[in-house]
Amino acid sequence: MLDAERRKCRFLEEWAPPNARVVWGRAEEQERDGYGVAVAKALAPPPIAAEWCLPLVREGGAVVLWVGPTADAAHVARVAEQIAAELAEQPPGFLVLRKTAPTPPGFPRRMGLARKRPIE
């Protein structure tokens, strides 16, 4: 579990199951291609959340975005393609992105850039 707020991490450390790891930090600072799954809920608009989460996941892994009814799946799919992934499933309320190759050079972008200049 990754969160930029120390207060939330302390709470998670107390209540997380023993097989879960809590990391205090930002997605842009984490190891590339190191995790099997990343799940994002209320992190950012779905295309930005995809850009932050996909570099964390290794080839063959998945990113699960918890989204609202107005999420633009086509836009998220375009972003995913640029970061070596594809839109695999769309169960109600979620978008599942499957990582198809290692993270390309240039990702994750510098801190704040995804929000300032989102991928179209």
Say what each PLM segment does.
Residues 1:
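Short beta-strand "acidic-cap" motif of Rossmann-like dinucleotide-binding folds
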Residues 4-120:
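S-adenosylmethionine
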